[in-house]
């Protein structure tokens, strides 16, 4: 079980309130990552929280393509810090190994995952949902390793959307009143799009979709 500092009263990150102090930087175990928090440049806009699907091997010292793009877009829009949490904490980049772990492992959330989502949402200036079509045949150009598991596609879609709704409800309860919830875009299946496959024309915050009040129950 990860240990963390007590945040006390919810306080938005600002120039003089370091993200490291509030979130105690990244939290990882060999198989799970619950939160990755990175300082960017001093700015008035504060912390951008991004909710992905599941964590890669990236950490505070090593980027991956998704983290590089998130960092670039967050800096472009004037955020002072970037924090990344995920719907699921299972940490793996190999489709073969992810498939071996099983759909149940992948689609299980809650617990420690939700604790870190709550903590980050309570101090974020803005939140972006960016998990992609997690229950469908592919993620962008990559085959979804869970598409051919024994669980039916319909059942996976129901559970995946249920987890999305669960997280959105959690964020709405915990976020600052003035904070907005965005998606870079919505896919055809009405899931928030994954940043890795999106054009730079969506880089500006002005082009993000405000989904603060969006109903994800029905897609």
Where are these predicted regions, by residue range?
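Feature marks short, surface-exposed loop/turn motifs that line or immediately flank catalytic pockets
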Residues: 57, 91, 135
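Short amphipathic alpha-helices and their capping/turn segments at secondary-structure boundaries
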Residues: 35-42, 62-82, 115-123
């Amino acid at each position: 079980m990860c240990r963390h500092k007590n945040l006390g009263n919810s306080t938005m990150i600002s120039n003089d309130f370091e993200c490291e102090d509030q979130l105690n930087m990244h939290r990882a175990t060999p198989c799970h990552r619950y939160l990755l928090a990175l300082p960017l440049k001093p700015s008035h806009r504060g912390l951008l929280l991004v909710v992905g699907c599941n964590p890669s091997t990236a950490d505070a010292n090593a980027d991956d393509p998704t983290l590089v793009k998130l960092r670039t877009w967050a800096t472009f829009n004037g955020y002072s810090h970037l924090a990344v949490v995920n719907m699921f904490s299972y940490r793996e980049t190999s489709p073969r190994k992810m498939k071996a772990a099983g759909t149940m492992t992948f689609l299980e959330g809650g617990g420690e995952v939700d604790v870190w989502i709550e903590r980050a949402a309570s101090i974020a200036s803005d939140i972006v949902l960016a998990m992609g079509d997690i229950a469908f045949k592919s993620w962008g150009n990559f085959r979804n390793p869970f598409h051919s598991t024994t669980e039916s596609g319909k059942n996976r879609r129901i559970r995946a959307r249920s987890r999305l709704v669960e997280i959105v409800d959690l964020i709405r309860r915990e976020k600052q009143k003035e904070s907005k919830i965005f998606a870079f875009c919505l896919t055809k299946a009405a899931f928030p799009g994954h940043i890795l496959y999106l054009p730079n024309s969506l880089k500006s915050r002005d082009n993000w979709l405000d989904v603060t009040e969006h109903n994800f129950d029905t897609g």
